[in-house]
From Swiss-Prot:
Cited Gene3D superfamilies: Galactose oxidase/kelch, beta-propeller (2.130.10.80), Immunoglobulins (2.60.40.10)
Record field: catalytic activity: glyoxal + O2 + H2O = glyoxylate + H2O2 + H(+); methylglyoxal + O2 + H2O = pyruvate + H2O2 + H(+)
Protein known as: Aldehyde oxidase GLOX
GO cellular component: extracellular space
Main localization, broad class: secreted
EC number per UniProt: 1.2.3.15
Enzyme kind, highest EC tier: oxidoreductase
Compartments where located: Secreted
Length: 559
């Protein structure tokens, strides 16, 4: 493993977040080593590794053979980083896991970049990271062949989501570099592996211009896909190639880049797996104005909007509630007990950089929000959001930040870089430098004895009933038992692509030594592919166990 020399040192502790309290509660834990690249994209690929990507500026501290790299493997067990060689520029790409466990990163920056490397354009790139069995990442590499494996259309700032056959639907983006709005849009959908020879045009993406980069999309349990962009939303039927227009987000709130709110598919529960979507943050800014007429001090919104995707729910429309504070660029992440973590973001301004009338250094945003909150979906309206017992960090996590649940049950948090290049702390005129510090946000159960799943089948069939051995701490009454099947998702630009939590019917034996649960009925409820199972007893969650949902075969390809 390569050293980051002085850059990756315990000196980072001098810039640490506040020390954790001795009292029980959530805690931020600043790691002793730096990431070497800005973690602006992150995805968990096994029990101990997070793949992170940066942009190819050629000035990152992390090196391979003396040259900068913009990919890395972060080891959750040792808090160390291993460089990962990347060919094309992965800046502002998307990604997900296929049905066979392969991680795919797609899209990126148009045009090559310089520095001490010459990276080819990334906006048609497909980057493939095969399943990695090594806990440290030793021998695990990224595959690229731009001449033969590439997108049908150029895409910078696209989104992606794993769908019912285990392939990826790739949505939107820009053909060209753009400082703020989407001025040369890729108003289309395509798939990986490809399902046809040409992209599918999207009237929805055309309507939702100009603030529709990184659309938020979720695979619904009937196989359709919910998409929200700008202040508009639809349900897209992949098999019929039709769209159903849904109500606009209330009060003119816009939620996609460069006016970033976040969105999440709320946990799905048996027997009906009724889908609901929550959208939080963003802004009411007027997109008819040029970015130079906007301000880094423009207030973000505290609004959250929630819709039930049934005929009755769609007719009723979005239900409005509010976070404890306004947030631009928040991120919403599933907690295994069914709550939603709300973290990161800024109180004012916008995404992107150096585009508004009064950037803060290079940042279009200001006033970082430093205290997370929890959203409880089944609590009464007006009482769903709380930050009681939540810690406060000193590290801004705004533009180009990431967060993801890990298999250990805590949250990896990294990144922040509203600058064109790697910009170290102390750079004159820069309030928000490139951030290499990594934290975890640790729930209270991390500091006590926990339930454990002692074994788990390597693969689960849809609808399969399984009994596995467990242990339960003696002080837990087991009055509430939850078994969650989760896709931990791909974090980038205030959105968690493919993130999913499906609760499974379950029971515990009288002697508390075994757990019986039933897997989801089909690949529409949980798209086939890698998953993590968590057991939560009385809000104390076990470490997760990885399984392959379905056969583990690759998704279908175009014949």
């Amino acid at each position: 493993m390569l050293s980051l020399l002085a850059v990756v040192s315990l000196a980072a502790a001098t810039l640490a977040a506040p020390a954790a309290s001795d009292a029980p509660g959530w805690r931020f834990d600043l790691k002793p080593n730096l990431s070497g690249i800005v973690a602006l994209e992150a995805i968990v690929v096994n029990s101990s590794l997070v793949v992170i990507f940066d942009r190819a500026t050629g000035d990152q501290p992390l090196k391979i053979n003396g040259e900068s790299t913009w990919g890395a493997l972060w080891d959750l067990d040792t808090s160390t980083v291993r460089p990962l060689s990347v060919l094309t520029d992965s800046f502002c790409a998307s990604g997900a896991l296929l049905s066979n466990g392969t991680m795919v990163s797609m899209g990126g920056t148009p045009g090559g970049t310089g520095g001490d490397v010459a990276a080819p354009p990334g906006n048609q790139a497909i980057r493939i990271f095969e399943p990695c069995a090594s806990p440290s990442g030793d021998g695990c590499t990224l595959f690229e062949d731009p001449a033969t494996v590439h997108l049908l259309e150029e895409r910078w700032y696209p989104s992606s989501v794993r769908i019912f056959d285990g392939s990826l639907m790739i949505i939107g983006g820009s053909h060209v570099l753009t400082p703020f709005y989407n001025v040369d849009p890729a108003n289309s959908f395509e798939f990986f592996p490809s399902k046809e020879q040409t992209p599918r045009p999207s009237a929805f993406l055309e309507r939702s211009l100009p603030a529709n980069l990184f659309p938020r999309a979720f695979a619904l349990p009937d196989g359709t896909v919910f998409i929200v962009a700008n202040n508009q939303s639809i349900i897209y039927d992949i098999e019929k190639n039709t769209e159903t227009i849904l109500p606009d987000i209330p009060n003119g709130v816009r939620v996609t880049n460069p006016i970033d709110g976040s969105a999440i598919l709320l946990p799905l529960s048996p027997p009906d797996f009724i889908p609901e979507v929550l959208v939080c943050g963003g802004s009411t800014a007027d997109t008819s104005l040029p970015s130079t007429s906007l301000s880094s001090q423009h207030p973000a919104t505290s609004q959250c909007s929630r819709i039930k995707l049934t005929p009755e729910g769609i007719k009723a429309g979005w239900q409005v509630e509010h976070m404890l504070e306004a947030r631009m660029m928040p991120e919403l992440v599933h907690v295994p007990n069914g709550q939603i973590l709300i973290t990161n973001g800024a109180g004012t301004g916008f995404a992107a950089l150096s585009a508004v009338a009064d950037p803060v250094g290079n940042s279009n945003a200001d006033h970082p929000v430093l205290t997370p909150s929890l959203y409880t979906p089944d609590a009464p309206l007006g009482k769903r959001i709380s930050n009681a017992g939540m810690p406060t960090t000193t590290i801004p996590r705004m533009y180009h930040s990431t967060v993801t649940l890990t298999q250990q049950g805590n949250f990896f948090i990294g990144g922040n870089n509203p600058n064109m290049n790697f910009t170290p702390p102390g750079t004159p005129g820069i309030k928000f430098p490139s951030e290499l510090r990594i934290e975890t946000l640790d729930p209270p159960f991390m500091f006590r004895s926990r339930p454990a799943l002692l074994t788990m089948p390597e693969k689960l069939k849809f609808g399969q009933k399984v009994t596995v051995p467990i242990t339960i701490p003696s002080d837990l009454k087991a009055s509430k038992v939850q078994v969650a099947l989760m896709d931990l998702g791909f974090s980038s630009h205030a959105f968690h692509s493919s993130a999913r939590l499906v609760f499974m019917e379950s029971s515990i034996s009288a002697d508390r030594k075994s757990l019986t649960f039933t897997a989801p009925p089909n690949g529409r409820v949980f798209p086939p592919g890698p998953a993590v199972v968590f057991l939560t007893i009385d809000d104390v969650t076990s470490p997760g166990e990885r399984v392959m949902m379905g056969s583990g075969n690759p998704p279908p390809t175009l014949e």
